[in-house]
Amino acid sequence: MNFTRILRHVLTGKLALRRIFPAASLTAIEQAIQQSELNHGGQICFAVEAALNTIPLLKNQTARERAVEVFSQLRIWDTEHNNGVLIYLLLADRDVEVIADRGIHAKVSSEEWEVICRSMESAFRQQQFESGVIEGINAVGSHLRKYFPSDPNHKKNELTNKPVMLE
């Protein structure tokens, strides 16, 4: 059991989430997703969670495991072309995970997603949260543009562009 991690999760609350991602940042992130999706046929969702609840924390749930749960809960997998991508941030751990549906995951390697995650985490270490998220959205969008180019006949928005603040 990692007591440092437990303490970090206990001390990282919803107020920290709102301080790091004020309304203006959330709007900028939403606009970045919307702009990105104009250039490809994929779907991007950004979700952020301040900290894990007690039981998952005591079971030492990883950010990756939690991201997979969130991917399912938000139904990112339920897009017409199986090209939904979740960018998940567990704020207490400053850990980013990218979970991609099978349509895009088959084309982009895990290592390529990892590069995006590490780049975002690097920005976060410098307190550049908004720009780090937007950089990640743009990087995911580059992959989606390559494998799922924009189709003017298929422009429906299947996932919310608003950042999902998990409580």
Predicted regions and their residues:
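Divalent-cation
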Residues: N2-G141, R145-P152, K156, K162, ...
